[in-house]
């Protein structure tokens, strides 16, 4: 059988049951893609485009908070091991999708995502 996971009303990820040994190498590739986007590509784009958030850890915070619609550390163990390694396969897919979309994002969208992320923490962009 096939399973479908919805990212939004228009985006779907098709998931087929696979043995764990088949998923593990693929998972590592997805994690590496997430790190390359959030630690290298997006910070470079952020600086060039004048995003209000440019540090890699802030970009990761925005992405993770957006996929949970809450502080990510309310859903994952903070500090035990990297958050991206704790994501379910579906949440990792959502994080990658959002990170890819951020490559084309306007500073206004990033400003909004950052404000949402900070509001989950009861902070404002000036804090």
Residue ranges and their predicted role:
Residues 1-127:
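Positively charged, phosphate-engaging catalytic surfaces used for nucleic-acid and nucleotide handling
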């Amino acid at each position: 059988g096939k399973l479908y996971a919805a990212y939004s009303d228009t985006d779907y990820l098709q998931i087929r049951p696979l043995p764990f040994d088949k998923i593990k190498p693929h998972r590592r590739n997805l994690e590496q893609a997430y790190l390359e986007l959030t630690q290298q590509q997006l910070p470079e784009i952020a600086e060039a485009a004048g995003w209000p958030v440019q540090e890699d850890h802030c970009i990761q915070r925005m992405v993770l908070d957006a996929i949970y619609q809450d502080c990510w550390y309310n859903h994952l163990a903070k500090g035990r091991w990297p958050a991206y390694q704790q994501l379910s396969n579906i949440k990792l897919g959502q994080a990658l999708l959002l990170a890819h979309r951020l490559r084309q994002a306007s500073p206004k969208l990033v400003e909004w995502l950052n404000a949402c992320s900070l509001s989950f923490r009861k902070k404002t962009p000036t804090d």
